[in-house]
C-alpha cells in the first residue's frame, strides 16, 4: 500500500464512518493535501485491490461502510453506474458502426 493510500484509508476509516460522515473528494483532497486525481485513483485501488469497504456517492462523497443498508445503497449505486456505462458503450459502438456504413455508402456512390 502506498503512503497516500494509507493516509486516505486511515482518514476515511476513522473520520468518515457511515454515510452521514461522508466527505466529498474535493474536501478530502484539501484536507489531506492530495490532488483530486490521485485521491480518486487511490480510493479505487483501496477498494479494488485492498478490498476496503469505502463507498462513494455522487452527492455525499466517500465514506466507510457502517451497516448492511449502506452496503446495499452503495452496491445499488455502483450497479446503476455500470448499467449506464454499458448503455453508453452500446450507443458508442452502434454510432461508430452507423458512421462506417455512411462512409462506405458515400464511397460506393463515387
Write out the residue ranges for each language-model feature.
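A short acidic, leucine-rich amphipathic alpha-helix
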Residues: 24-31
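Minor-groove-contacting beta-hairpin "wing" of winged helix-turn-helix DNA-binding domains
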Residues: 58-66
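Long, low-complexity, charge-rich intrinsically disordered regions
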Residues: 75-110
Amino acid at each position: 500500500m502506498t503512503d497516500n493510500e494509507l493516509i486516505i484509508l486511515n482518514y476515511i476509516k476513522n473520520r468518515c464512518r457511515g454515510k452521514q460522515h461522508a466527505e466529498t473528494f474535493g474536501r478530502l483532497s484539501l484536507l489531506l493535501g492530495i490532488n483530486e486525481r490521485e485521491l480518486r485513483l487511490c480510493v479505487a485501488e483501496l477498494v479494488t485491490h485492498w478490498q476496503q469497504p469505502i463507498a462513494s456517492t455522487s452527492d455525499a462523497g466517500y465514506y466507510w461502510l457502517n451497516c448492511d443498508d449502506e452496503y446495499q445503497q452503495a452496491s445499488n449505486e455502483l450497479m446503476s453506474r455500470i448499467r449506464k456505462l454499458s448503455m453508453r458503450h452500446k450507443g458508442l459502438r452502434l454510432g461508430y458502426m452507423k458512421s462506417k456504413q455512411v462512409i462506405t455508402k458515400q464511397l460506393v456512390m463515387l
